Amino acid sequence: MYSDLSKYFADVKDKSAHDVCEFIGGKVKQNDFKNCCAVRMSYAFNKAGIKIPFTENKTVSGEGKKDWYIYRVKDFKAFLNSKNYKKYTTKQNSLDDFDNKTGVIVFDVDWEDATGHVDLFNGKSVEGSDYTSQSKSITLYEIN
C-alpha cells in the first residue's frame, strides 16, 4: 500500500499549492488553498484506493465530484486515527525512532497559517518537505 501512496504522491509533491489546486480542479481549484499538504495526501490516498469520505466543513470535492479532499492537517490526522494505523510519536527533533518504518508522517508545528505538515516517510527520509527541526512532536502512522 505504501508503494501506491508514494507513486501517486509523486504526481503532486513537487507542484506549487496553486498548481495542485489547478491539477485537482473542482472546489479544490475554487478555494486555491495556500497550504496544500493535506490536499496532496488526500490525492495520493484517493488514487491508491483509500477513499477520503465526505465530511461536512472538512472536505471539498475535486473535478467531477467523485473524490473528496481534506484541506487541514488536523482533519487529516483525525482521518488517519479513524483508520487505526499503528502510530509512533516522538517529541525529539529526530526521525531516528522511525527508521525502517514507512507511512504518513505528521509534523505538529505552530505556524500562523497552519497547525502542521503531513507527508510520506519512506523508512529513511521524508519524501516531500521535512519540518523535523521546527516540530513540537512528530507522529508516524505506519503503512506498509
Predicted segment positions?
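...with weaker cross-activation on analogous glycine-rich loops/strands in unrelated enzymes
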Residues: T59-Y131
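Weak global preference for isoleucine
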Residues: I24, I50-I52, I70, I105, ...
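Glycine-rich, aromatic-bearing surface loops/beta-hairpins
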Residues: S125-N144
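N-terminal capping segments
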Residues: M1-K66
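Residue-level marker of intrinsically disordered, low-complexity segments enriched
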Residues: G26, C37, T102-V104, G116, ...
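Active-site-proximal beta-strand/loop segments in catalytic clefts of secreted hydrolases
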Residues: A44, F107-D110, I143
